């Protein structure tokens, strides 16, 4: 489930840490969260799409690793990011 270029630019603009930032951990987590949301909606309608289900689990794992990295680097930034993204109760 690829994101449209316009939506990618919106996410980058919202989560970038400086003007030329396109690949920081914050931006990557935001992109993965968007992809996970779209893929979850797809899987609700297509329950037997096992290859997409595996891709979803891989994305969730990657997002978890990136969030762990952010948490180790800066606890305040981590808390602000998960609040903005609306993940983890």
Swiss-Prot record:
Classification via InterPro entries: Ribosomal_uS15, Ribosomal_uS15_bac-type, uS15_NS1_RNA-bd_sf
Lineage top rank: taxon: Bacteria
Signal peptide: none
Alphabetized UniProt keyword annotations: Ribonucleoprotein, Ribosomal protein, RNA-binding, rRNA-binding
GO cellular component, one term: cytosolic small ribosomal subunit
Keyword Ribonucleoprotein: yes
Keyword Cytoplasm: no
Membership in a protein family: Belongs to the universal ribosomal protein uS15 family.
Function text: One of the primary rRNA binding proteins, it binds directly to 16S rRNA where it helps nucleate assembly of the platform of the 30S subunit by binding and bridging several RNA helices of the 16S rRNA. Forms an intersubunit bridge (bridge B4) with the 23S rRNA of the 50S subunit in the ribosome.
Subunit structure: Part of the 30S ribosomal subunit. Forms a bridge to the 50S subunit in the 70S ribosome, contacting the 23S rRNA.
Annotated protein name in UniProt: Small ribosomal subunit protein uS15
Organism: Trichodesmium erythraeum (strain IMS101)
Gene name linked to the record: rpsO
């Amino acid at each position: 489930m690829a994101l449209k270029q316009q939506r990618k630019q919106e996410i980058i603009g919202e989560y970038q840490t400086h003007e030329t930032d396109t690949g920081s951990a914050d931006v990557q987590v935001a992109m993965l969260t968007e992809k996970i949301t779209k893929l979850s909606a797809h899987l609700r309608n297509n329950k037997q799409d096992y290859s997409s289900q595996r891709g979803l689990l891989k994305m969730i794992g990657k997002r978890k690793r990136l969030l762990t990295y952010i948490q180790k680097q800066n606890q305040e930034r981590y808390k602000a990011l998960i609040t903005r993204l609306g993940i983890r109760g």
